[in-house]
């Protein structure tokens, strides 16, 4: 079970993604959640370790198939 903070990050990325395949910038996630970039980076790293995000080095955040299913479920509930 994910913490409420991790769920907020998943939902923010999901809402920001115009095209899921293009990914989302971590800066945009930080701005959406009104957190500092280092805080967002730590949480994104944690979500990568949980297998919900993939992140390019100095690049965009992408959902894994599992992460996308989870975010979609959160969004529709």
Model-derived features: positions:
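A short, conserved structural fragment
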Residues: 48-58
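Short alpha-helical segment immediately N-terminal to, or the first helix within
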Residues: 18-19, 52, 74
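N-terminal helix-turn-helix DNA-binding core of bacterial DNA-binding proteins
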Residues: 2-35
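Basic, amphipathic "hinge/linker" alpha-helix immediately C-terminal to the N-terminal HTH DNA-binding motif
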Residues: 59-75
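Key DNA-contact positions within bacterial/archaeal DNA-binding proteins
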Residues: 38
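Short, hydrophobic-biased segments on the C-terminal half of alpha helices
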Residues: 44-45
């Amino acid at each position: 079970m994910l913490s409420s903070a991790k769920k907020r990050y998943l939902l923010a990325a999901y809402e920001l993604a115009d095209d899921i395949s293009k990914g989302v910038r971590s800066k945009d996630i930080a701005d959406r959640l009104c957190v500092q970039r280092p805080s967002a980076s730590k949480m994104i790293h944690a979500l990568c370790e949980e297998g919900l995000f993939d992140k390019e080095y100095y690049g965009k955040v992408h959902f894994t198939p599992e992460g996308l299913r989870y975010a979609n479920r959160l969004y529709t509930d």
